[in-house]
């Protein structure tokens, strides 16, 4: 931290700690504007979460991954995220059917998905703590929030690697489903849950498909935003120039002679333009 080796608190939990530090930084001088980059580790392997968050999802995923994907696809249509004419992509034939799993397998994967969902909700709750702090310090109304993800759901299970298992056991990690999400646990939802979690997209992380490359982008704050859902194509490299325009900072910034890439998507947010990319650009 600031060029010095940092230490973690005894009761460290990444989502809570990241927000605690951001509040600490902002609190140092409330008279100054701020830019905060919160690089949450949720949801990422090893997938750990306070048990009360995991337990909130008891029974939610007992219907299996096919049912979850079907339900989410229907809901996506209901809230107009996709068109009424859209057709669901079938689960790949090499994937397992939930009905073919035995009792122990179902228990393992249900607990894994509960931990995954709980970790995501916990991150959301900590973002809520930051929002509450900004409201208390009268900084909320002048703050723009941008929330996105780097890729679609992760499907790999690290314990499938013999080399990783050597490291896991040497460092005291376990994959006991009864303790999924607890300290020193390591959990993976597998390809079937990942496929369902990416709904309505196809596939997941590591693939050149919508389930991997198309992620949510949530932006709020500071009145110029046009409310609602927008399907415009944007890239993560467009975030930085957009922030600069929102803050009225010159965008012709160079680093070692290299200009910043990306385009400002403010015209899309304000309703001035439908897209910042042409139909043939990607």
Question: Can you name each region flagged by the protein language model?
Answer:
Residues 1-7, 95-112, 216, 220-225:
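Short glycine/proline-rich turn/loop motifs
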Residues 7-15, 105-121, 187:
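Short acidic-aromatic active-site loops that bind/stabilize oxyanions
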Residues 15-94, 119, 123, 128, ...:
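Active-site regions of oxyanion-processing enzymes, predominantly non-cytosolic
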Residues 48-49, 132-220:
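Histidine-centered active-site microenvironments of extracellular/periplasmic hydrolases
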Residues 183-210, 224-232, 236-282:
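C-terminal cap/loop subdomain of S1 sulfatases and analogous C-terminal strand-loop tails that border
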């Amino acid at each position: 931290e600031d060029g010095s080796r940092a230490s973690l608190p005894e009761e460290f939990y990444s989502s809570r700690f990241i927000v605690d530090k951001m509040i600490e930084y902002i609190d140092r001088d409330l008279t100054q504007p701020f830019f905060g980059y919160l690089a949450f580790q949720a949801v990422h392997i090893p997938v750990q979460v306070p048990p009360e968050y995991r337990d909130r999802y008891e029974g939610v995923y007992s219907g299996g991954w096919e049912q979850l994907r079907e339900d989410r696809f229907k809901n996506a249509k209901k809230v107009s995220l996709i068109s009424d004419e859209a057709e669901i992509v079938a689960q790949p034939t090499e994937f397992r059917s939930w009905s073919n799993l035995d009792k122990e397998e179902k228990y393992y994967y249900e607990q894994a998905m509960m931990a995954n969902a709980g970790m995501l909700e916990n991150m959301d709750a900590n973002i809520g703590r930051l929002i509450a702090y900004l409201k208390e310090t009268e900084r909320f109304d002048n703050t723009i929030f941008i929330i996105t993800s780097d890729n679609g759901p992760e499907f790999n299970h690290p314990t499938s690697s013999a080399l990783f298992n050597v490291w896991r056991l040497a460092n005291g990690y376990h994959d006991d489903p009864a303790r999924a999400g607890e300290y020193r646990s390591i959990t993976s939802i597998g390809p079937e849950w990942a496929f369902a979690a990416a709904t309505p997209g196809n596939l997941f992380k590591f693939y050149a498909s919508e389930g991997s490359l198309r992620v949510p982008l949530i932006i709020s704050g500071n009145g110029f935003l046009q409310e609602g859902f927008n399907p415009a194509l944007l890239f993560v490299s467009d975030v930085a120039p957009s922030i600069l325009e929102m803050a009225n900072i010159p965008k012709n910034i160079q680093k070692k002679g290299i200009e910043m890439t990306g385009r400002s998507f403010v015209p899309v947010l304000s309703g001035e333009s439908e897209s910042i990319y042409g139909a043939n650009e990607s």
